């Protein structure tokens, strides 16, 4: 896999740090795909992230909301060593980060049937929402014509 060094670009740009972080994150995206997840659009301003983390308990998983990101970490508690004939359920530690768009916030998280469901909502401030501006017509009969002078 080819890697790129973006440090020369950081020296000459201002305010684009998040853009370069997203590029680096996309570059590392193919490295690990555990745990599997779905991202659903529930309604126009509501989303849900579902992570399949069978074998983990809610105490072994943490969800952290940061600015424009939500981080899910899991670490299985060490228990007595067992002898497995076949081990198909992974219990390895993981860390998964999801980058969020502006104004998207974590509303809640729930653990149900081996799935961690994280509810997201997009709340755009009133000042940022589009609004319709009424167009007033000029009253008729108030048009004044200027007299032209000969040059």
Curated annotation (Swiss-Prot):
Pfam entry (one): HSP20
Claim: Cell wall biogenesis/degradation is one of the keywords in the record: no
GO cellular component: cytoplasm
PROSITE patterns with a match to the protein in the record: SHSP
sHSP domain sequence ranges: 28-138
Top-level lineage group: Bacteria
Entries under SUPFAM superfamilies matching the protein: HSP20-like chaperones
Keywords: Stress response
InterPro entries documented for this protein: A-crystallin/Hsp20_dom (IPR002068), ACD_IbpA/B (IPR037913), HSP20-like_chaperone (IPR008978)
Record family assignment: Belongs to the small heat shock protein (HSP20) family.
PANTHER family: PTHR47062, SMALL HEAT SHOCK PROTEIN IBPA
Protein name: Small heat shock protein HspH
Organism: Bradyrhizobium diazoefficiens (strain JCM 10833 / BCRC 13528 / IAM 13628 / NBRC 14792 / USDA 110)
Gene symbol of the encoding locus: hspH
């Amino acid at each position: 896999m080819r890697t790129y060094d973006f440090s020369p670009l950081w020296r000459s740009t201002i305010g684009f740090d998040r853009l370069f972080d997203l590029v680096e994150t996309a570059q590392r995206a193919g490295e690990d795909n555990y745990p599997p997840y779905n991202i659903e659009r529930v309604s126009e301003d509501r989303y849900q992230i579902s992570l399949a983390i069978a074998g983990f308990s809610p105490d072994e998983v943490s969800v952290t909301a940061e600015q424009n990101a939500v981080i899910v970490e899991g670490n299985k508690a060490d228990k007595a060593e067992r002898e497995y004939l076949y081990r198909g359920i992974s219990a390895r530690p993981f860390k998964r980060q999801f980058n969020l768009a502006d104004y998207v916030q974590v509303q809640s998280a729930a653990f149900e049937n081996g799935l961690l469901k994280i509810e997201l909502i997009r709340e755009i401030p009133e000042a940022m929402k589009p609004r319709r501006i009424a167009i007033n017509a000029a009253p008729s009969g108030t048009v004044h014509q200027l007299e032209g002078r000969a040059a």
